[in-house]
Amino acid sequence: MQNSHSGVNQLGGVFVNGRPLPDSTRQKIVELAHSGARPCDISRILQVSNGCVSKILGRYYETGSIRPRAIGGSKPRVATPEVVNKIAHYKRECPSIFAWEIRDRLLSEGVCTNDNIPSVSSINRVLRNLASDKQQMGSEGMYDKLRMLNGQTATWGSRPGWYPGTSVPGQPAQEGCQPQEGVGENTNSISSNGEDSDEAQMRLQLKRKLQRNRTSFTQEQIEALEKEFERTHYPDVFARERLAAKIDLPEARIQVWFSNRRAKWRREEKLRNQRRQASNTPSHIPISSSFSASVYQPIPQPTTPVSSFTSGSMLGRTDTALTNSYSALPPMPSFTMGNNLPMQPPVPSQTSSYSCMLPTSPSVNGRSYDTYTPPHMQTHMNSQPMGTSGTTSTGLISPGVSVPVQVPGSEPDMSQYWPRLQ
């Protein structure tokens, strides 16, 4: 043991590169594991790396041995010709067999021991080599047939090779008709080709059968598996082994079943979420581009120009004083109170809402107050001059705004009315 090869690990333990742990340390690792200590605790107690502890325990659980593997040089070959022949025999008996099943049969039949049993990856490598050898043998047989056919066609044509030479139309074809005694040989070769084709068909069928048949579960097994799946979607190795002993199934089959069942559960959960979202989404109401006239009534437009409302005729009388006073005003814009009011029936409280009155002319006598007329009823009344009787008209409050007012029909005391708004 050289000092240059020794060292101290991260936990403070001493190790030697390339050399296994002492048997005493290995025995302590196994004893602590049997006492219930976790690998991380064993690593801290014995100052051995966690990877080393896990590797020793894994090999102990798998083979029951704590001895180290062979060190130095190449590992002994475990895939001996005898083991390879056995693997090929098992594969021929059951083409859908798994590598771990072959490994179990090698152990149960005593072909190998725990020390020289090949790993699952080694068995898979042997199976791949056997399949490639079969394919290579089949391709070599096909090449032999092609070479044989090439040799026969060389006697049929005028020149040797893969493709016989074509005869010229003017050239007599005696050479192609001469070999008559080789007909029997040709029939023999055809029959041999038929046998080889049958073998090729059998090989193809065997290759198709390499896929493992689906495992069929009984109702009791399915119920037990579903019950365990309801408890947990990811059972540990102990739960799988307990379930395997209960329903008489290999632990690997149970692991594959749980993997497939989880995939099915994810698909079903996705569909449930889609249905839930579809049920929560409200149905779309089509929006109509046209509105009913009963809901939104059109606002009537004035039929006469705005300039006509500036004259005295819009008051419904021919008073010269009013005509002179209103004719000097600028033209009114089209936005008037009558046009902007909503179309609603008159309310009794609105009949006296407008109390601003216009002064009457001294020449007008014997007039009475008229009731308030809504704007939608006076749209066509503004353009027609009325008589000398009192009518509803619009009076100016400010430039650009006109409101309907009541014109007094008599000469009462003007002190009870508001003065004209300036």
Swiss-Prot record:
Residue range(s) of DNA binding per entry: 4-130, 210-269
GO biological process, one term: type B pancreatic cell differentiation
Keyword field contains Methyltransferase: no
Listed GO CC annotations: nucleus
SMART domains assigned to the protein according to its UniProt record, in alphabetical order: HOX (SM00389), PAX (SM00351)
Localization in the cell: Nucleus
Annotated stretches, region: Disordered: 170-200, 268-289
Annotated function: May be a transcription factor with important functions in eye and nasal development.
Family the entry assigns: Belongs to the paired homeobox family.
Protein name: Paired box protein Pax-6
Gene (UniProt): pax6
